[in-house]
C-alpha cells in the first residue's frame, strides 16, 4: 500500500448509480492491464460501483485516447471516464509530443463534453517505472487512485 504524503487522501464516497467508462491504450499492455484492473476493483470494492455500470473499451495507442473517449461519450451516457495509457520515453522527442498532446486532448474532451475525464496516463522513463506504478514489483497501483477520482468527479457532475 502507498505510504507518504504524496497522493490523494482516501475517499469513502459511494457511487452505485454511476456509469463509468474506461478507455485504455493497447500499447504496453503488461502495465495497462493491472492499471485497468486496479481502477475497476477500487470502484467496485471501495465505492460500490456496479460492475455492469463499468464499460471498458480500447484504442490502438495513447494518442487515440481523446478521440476514442469523445466518440464513446457521444454514443452513450457516462458520469465519468478514465483514459488509461502508458508512455515510455525513448531516444527521440516522440514521447514529449505524444504526452503533451494526450494530456491536453483529454482535458479538452472533458471540458467540452461536461463529462469528467480522469487522466490515467503514466509518463515514465523506462519499463521498470511503468510496472512499479502499475502496482507490480512492490509499487503502488495508480489505477486505484484513478478509480476513486472517477467516482468523486462523477458524483460532482451528477449532483
Curated annotation (Swiss-Prot):
5-amino-6-(D-ribitylamino)uracil binds at residues 27, 62-64, 86-88, 119. Homopentamer. (2S)-2-hydroxy-3-oxobutyl phosphate binds at residues 91-92, 133. GO terms for cellular component: cytoplasm; mitochondrial intermembrane space; nucleus; riboflavin synthase complex. GO terms for biological process: riboflavin biosynthetic process. GO terms for molecular function: 6,7-dimethyl-8-ribityllumazine synthase activity; riboflavin binding; riboflavin synthase activity. Catalyzes the formation of 6,7-dimethyl-8-ribityllumazine by condensation of 5-amino-6-(D-ribitylamino)uracil with 3,4-dihydroxy-2-butanone 4-phosphate. This is the penultimate step in the biosynthesis of riboflavin. Also binds riboflavin with an unexpected high affinity. The gene is rib4. Changing residue 27 to F/Y: Minor effects on the kinetic properties. Pathway: Cofactor biosynthesis; riboflavin biosynthesis; riboflavin from 2-hydroxy-3-oxobutyl phosphate and 5-amino-6-(D-ribitylamino)uracil: step 1/2. This is 6,7-dimethyl-8-ribityllumazine synthase. Keywords: Riboflavin biosynthesis, Transferase. Signal peptide: none annotated. The active site is at 94 (proton donor). Competitively inhibited by riboflavin (Ki of 17 uM). Belongs to the DMRL synthase family. HAMAP family: Lumazine_synth (MF_00178). Gene3D superfamilies: Lumazine/riboflavin synthase.
Amino acid at each position: 500500500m502507498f505510504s507518504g504524503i504524496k497522493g490523494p487522501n482516501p475517499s469513502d464516497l459511494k457511487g452505485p448509480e454511476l456509469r463509468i467508462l474506461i478507455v485504455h491504450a493497447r500499447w504496453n499492455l503488461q502495465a495497462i492491464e493491472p492499471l485497468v484492473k486496479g481502477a475497476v476493483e477500487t470502484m467496485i470494492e471501495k465505492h460500490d460501483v456496479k460492475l455492469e455500470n463499468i464499460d471498458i473499451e480500447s484504442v490502438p495507442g495513447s494518442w487515440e485516447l481523446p478521440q476514442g473517449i469523445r466518440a464513446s461519450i457521444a454514443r452513450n451516457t457516462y458520469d465519468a471516464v478514465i483514459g488509461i495509457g502508458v508512455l515510455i520515453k525513448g531516444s527521440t522527442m516522440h514521447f514529449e509530443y505524444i504526452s503533451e498532446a494526450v494530456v491536453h486532448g483529454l482535458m479538452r474532451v472533458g471540458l467540452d463534453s461536461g463529462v469528467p475525464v480522469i487522466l490515467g496516463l503514466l509518463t515514465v522513463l523506462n519499463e521498470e517505472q511503468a510496472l512499479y506504478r502499475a502496482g507490480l514489483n512492490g509499487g503502488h497501483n495508480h489505477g486505484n487512485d484513478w478509480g476513486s477520482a472517477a467516482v468523486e468527479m462523477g458524483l460532482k457532475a451528477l449532483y
